Amino acid sequence: MADAPDHSLNGRRHLEFTPIGYSRQNPLKRLSRSPIQTVAEDDNNGNGMSEEGPFKKQRRADLDDTIASHRMFNDSSQFDDTLPQLNGQSADNDNDNAHDSGKETDDVVKNLMGNLKENAPASNPLKEQQEQLHKLNTDNYNLRLKCNSLLKFLHNVTDQGELTKSLGLLDEIHEWKQKHYTLNQQYLELKAKLIQVEANAAENKQEPVTEVDHTACQRELSYVQNQLEKTTLQLNTYRDEVAHLEDKTIRIQEDQRAKEEQHQLEIQMLRSDVNNLNVSLVNKESELEEDRAKIQRLMNQLHEFDHKGSQSLLDLERQLEMKRDSISSLEKEVRALTHDRVHLETRIKDREIENAKIQSELERLRDNVKNNNSSNFEIGELKHAKASLDDKVRNLTEERHNLNQRISALRKECDEWKSKYQRNESLDSNHRKAFDSLRQELQTTKTQLEETRKTAQQLQTQVIENTTKNSERTSQRIKDKETQIQKLESELQFCKQQLKDGSRRLQAEEERCRETFESELQNLEMKNGFERTKLEREITLLKEERVALIETHDRELELWKSKCDALNKENDILVRQEIGDLDGVKRKLSQQLDKLQEKLTTAEGERGDLAEKLIKLQHSKDSYKDELKRVSSKLEYLSKEYLKSKQSAINDDEQKTKYNTMKQRLLVELKSLQDENLSLERKLLEQRGSSSRSQESSSRSSSTTQDRLDYYKLKYNNEVKHNNDLRIMNDYLNRVLRASSQHLKLDLLKLESEISQPAVPSSRTYKTVLDDDRYRPRFRSGLISPGHIPTFKAVALLVLACVRMKQTAVRCRWDEHRIRYLRNKMAIDDDRITW
């Protein structure tokens, strides 16, 4: 019988933990640590103690310390089906010093290894979901009932129900934050007062109390009075200078504005004249070119028809002379207009240079006016006058625009006449072509006649030569030739008749064209004269308007001058009022100086009182220091607790936002399900109607309906799963909110009780544990931390979770493929159907 292994404290260190369950001797002779080794063991080892007895288990440090310490999970959590159950017993506290404070922590149940059951039932959620999938193959009516019930449930559970408690807790947290802020401000004020008291005490100790001497104050008072008198004198002089400068600037501004407006009006008038002259110049040049073209055409016609009568030549020469006279007169007018334009352009340039100089002077004067900060009202009125003048200028520009429109209309009419003239020219050219063709035909007939005559002569000579040889043959030939000659003579007469008819027609066409050209020329001359008289009248009207505008401008200038004189008088009155106000200010200053002297006497009395108070404050300095220490310790504790409460409040806000977003998402999904349900019912009704109508497509419709049923069943099952998951998450978030709010309430009650208690006694037995070291991972040199050594059970659960996750992922992927396939198949079947 082998001896039992040594299970004492020192012997247990040489054993190694194995997943099978038995312990064997560690061959490395190295200290091995169990993941459930307690903190007390390390403390005992540090102190050199080796006590045997039952050891308490300690949980490993993990990421969920905060959740476990705040009791986030209760018995109804969503993880209770897959995690081992907890015993209802409370965990023992390892720290003995914490029991001396009078606050027990046994009511907080921690998720320790000792509280886990061995044979706790574990659920299989994937299997349950498969069973639910088989059970939930219901029709559309059940789906609608469930959707309506869920909607009613969600409408009943509002934020005004259970969430009002968490909102009240948030309000309490906000109040505690404000209290902490006020306490901190009071603490800082007390600290500043204490520093001031210490500084005043040190100064009073160093400097002995001396009698107050008022000679310096009296000197300062006299100096201030002298300075005040000097400044008032300077102010008066400056005001006189400013008034003088304002008068000067106003006069200069008025002169410059008058000059500027006059120059602008002159420039605008000159520009309008130049524009009109340019327009008339362009028109005259176009008319000149047209007249030249007409003269050229008439000259060509004269050269072509010089064989005609002398009367037409004389008429044409007269027309030519008239046109030359009109051209020479037009050229003279163009030269005069160009000379006027050059003169006007030079005048405009001079005016622009003068305007630039005036504008530079105006800008300089405006800068002076801005520096003086006066006469804004006059400037505004002048701006208003300038705006009115601008309106008048706009009206003139509109009139000019109307005149331009009239000129454009006249140009259009001229273009129409030109097009008509071109048409006549084209007709004339066609007639000429016809005449040329007739001439060519005549020439060809003449050449044929000459050839026939030549042949006749040759035949006569042959007849004379061959009279003796073959008289009969020659006589026959002579007859044939005579008949041919007769035919040719008849053709010649016909051609002559055609030539005469063509010449008559040509003469009539020439006379008609000449008459039309002469009438058009007369009309154009009449129109040009009418337009010239019209433009001269418009120019005279514009000149009269210019004279009227200049007269109105002079009247307005006189009005503005009268207004400026009135404003100067008002300015003098205001200056006198300001001088009176300055005298009143002097009196007030003297009264204030008297009051200051009285305050000085009272301040000396208060200084003596303050010296007495200072002596009293020195005595109470030690008591303030003690109180300050107590307040600082309390403030540090409160700041730590406030940081903790702030972090928990941030978590609560995040969870609340998650809850609201989840709720909205659920409502949206339910609405979409209802819409799908209605569309399903409509499709079912349509399918039933179509099945009664078309018996031939019964097999195809049955397959499509089966596909549709499979598709909507799969989709319905997926939505049910999704809704279940969302409901579980919603319940979990509600429980977390409830637990966190309860924990916050407890913490706040603790804080209130600790603040209401008197100062903490400075004893060794009392020890506040703000940061519990029990859950902190402990490391030893050369070893892995126990928090990183997983147990066999944890690894097995992790593997099982991974397998289940893989199975669910494969099933979800398969469902998605199936839904996609059915959707495509339904779409193809719908495309096949022909209504």
Curated annotation (Swiss-Prot):
Region described as Disordered: 1-59, 73-105, 685-706
Subcellular localization: Nucleus; Cytoplasm, Cytoskeleton, Microtubule organizing center, Spindle pole body
Source organism per UniProt: Zygosaccharomyces rouxii (strain ATCC 2623 / CBS 732 / NBRC 1130 / NCYC 568 / NRRL Y-229)
Keyword Repressor: no
UniProt name for this protein: Spindle pole body component 110
Compositionally biased tracts (Basic and acidic residues): 96-105
GO CC terms, sorted: cytoplasm; nucleus; spindle pole body
Role description: Component of the spindle pole body (SPB) required for the proper execution of spindle pole body (SPB) duplication. Potential role in cross-linking filaments or anchoring other molecules. It is essential for growth.
Positions with biased composition (Polar residues): 74-91
Subunit structure, as described in the record: Homodimer.
Keywords carried by this UniProt record: Coiled coil, Cytoplasm, Cytoskeleton, Nucleus
UniProt keyword Nucleus present: yes
